[in-house]
Amino acid sequence: MKRSTTRTLTTHTGSLPRPLALLELLNAKEAGTLNDHNALHASVKSAVAEVVKQQVDAAVDIVSDGELGKIGYSTYVKDRLTGFDGEGSVSVRADWADFPDALARQVRSPGVARPSCNGPIAWKDKSAVQVDIDIMQAAVTRAAPQEAFMTAASPGVIAHFLQNQYYATRGEYLATLANVMKEEFEA
């Protein structure tokens, strides 16, 4: 990992705004109506390449993929792991009234599914992790940032958004999530 003794290195974490065309494809995938998975892959690859270049151009030292290929920073795991087929809950954000632009974007979106955990958690699509890595590596090769990293959902944030209806205790749920997600953390 890059270090500096002369200045604070810059980075960020979290989701960056997705291009509208990519957002529409992600929403179609989420709704189960995506017909062209190749178009989604190409759109993610293009968007990640552009956002990495923009970060380099903005002098960000340690860039990320902005989570552009994920429907949500924590809920994407439902597509990669088993055990998330239960009825979910939707949280209502009271602060939306103060941010009408954010509310308007949310209204256009069909929403992100937040199923609950209702079965044993295991990997069902480990290859998706490698796809994310390959897309990011291609973007990094083109833009040549000083350093790059990728995020992964923590067990705590997954447990917060995807409620447990299967494991006997929250501790057991978190421990299982940590054990399974460890493979993504180490990839």
Question: Residue locations for each model-derived region?
Answer:
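Domain-level signal for soluble alpha/beta catalytic cores
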Residues: 1-187
